């Protein structure tokens, strides 16, 4: 398909474990996607042989996940599907244990989130409880600037639910109240009763829920606002990997977050100030005259060794607001998952775009109200779970970050400690290291 045909939208699927994310996603890809029929037949046969019939769609996704984890060559078209109006890419495999980290550093910004809810008694309640993932994922999506959301009330076919309008209304009300607290406007969000396994209200209107008059999933997807891509901003391209390719040379790989990259440009890398000329740009083994935000590309540079640049560095245009190393940065942080108290001096690892670097909480300036941003306490001694605060951080090693308002993907981060995401942050000011 030519690049110009349909607008491209990045989709993230969030929600509690076992809410049916994989089954529903698998079903969508299966019915509207680029999966080769032969591949599906092979998966179906294996699925039946292993007695996994009921997981047919999730099984498709599991096989894709396994292929994705084996190497970078997996055919990314497998994660795409099309509707009448848009071309969708699913940008993270739900259920992945690093899902929260991936959502933040994610190789891309999601334009829309599908929040998957399990409707059966007890399952919805577990997901929305204090330690359920529904709340955490919704809060994350909003904090990270995913403004559009579609809610799917899944497993409506389960016998305790049986497409009950009463159960639908009960869940819709409780979820609306929570989403409003987070910052979403529930009246702009479709709440769709579906069965991810049977396909009710996904691509065709179900006769099982005649009381439901809203959009079905495919209609809600087509009704999304097309995302604005920041083509006119200066280039920022965080490196995911750097390869040395015989006969070609050094090839950094990453996703264009803002601006454009094209052959002939003088590329400056931060934080290490290496400058090199971009010789060529390619995507899916095709040479491009230029790459724009959202494109995952490799580009060839001359005169720079693989040792000089690495994952976590940021490529920019040497002649247009080049990226620089950050000396300190000031940000709003939300503590989500920390067992104790966080005080000045705390030095966890930050995952920001593709960088993974320890940073010190130098000063905790204010504890603030998450929704209004107003100060609740100045210079608090410590902050704990559920708190939002304004803090100054100092990287322990060279790091390039940006202000969230200017370069969103380089201005949000996950705080990692004890193998989990303990906090998320959004950068408000950056003190750059000069020359």
Swiss-Prot record:
Which Pfam family name is an example for this entry?
A: GTP-eEF1A_C
Its function, per the record, reads: This protein promotes the GTP-dependent binding of aminoacyl-tRNA to the A-site of ribosomes during protein biosynthesis.
* Region feature (G4): 154-157
Extract the ranges annotated as region (G1): 15-22
The protein here is known as Elongation factor 1-alpha
Q: What's the source species for this entry?
A: Tetrahymena pyriformis
Q: Which CDD domains match?
A: EF1_alpha, EF1_alpha_II, EF1_alpha_III
PANTHER family per the UniProt record, alphabetical: TRANSLATION FACTOR (PTHR23115)
Q: Which Gene3D superfamilies match?
A: P-loop containing nucleotide triphosphate hydrolases, Translation factors
Region annotation (G5) ranges:
195-197
Homology family? Belongs to the TRAFAC class translation factor GTPase superfamily. Classic translation factor GTPase family. EF-Tu/EF-1A subfamily.
Q: Which InterPro entries does UniProt cross-reference here?
A: EFTu-like_2, G_TR_CS, GTP-eEF1A_C, P-loop_NTPase, T_Tr_GTP-bd_dom, TRAFAC_GTPase_members, Transl_B-barrel_sf, Transl_elong_EF1A/Init_IF2_C
Taxonomic lineage of the native organism: Eukaryota, Sar, Alveolata, Ciliophora, Intramacronucleata
* Keywords associated with the record: Cytoplasm, Elongation factor, GTP-binding, Nucleotide-binding, Protein biosynthesis
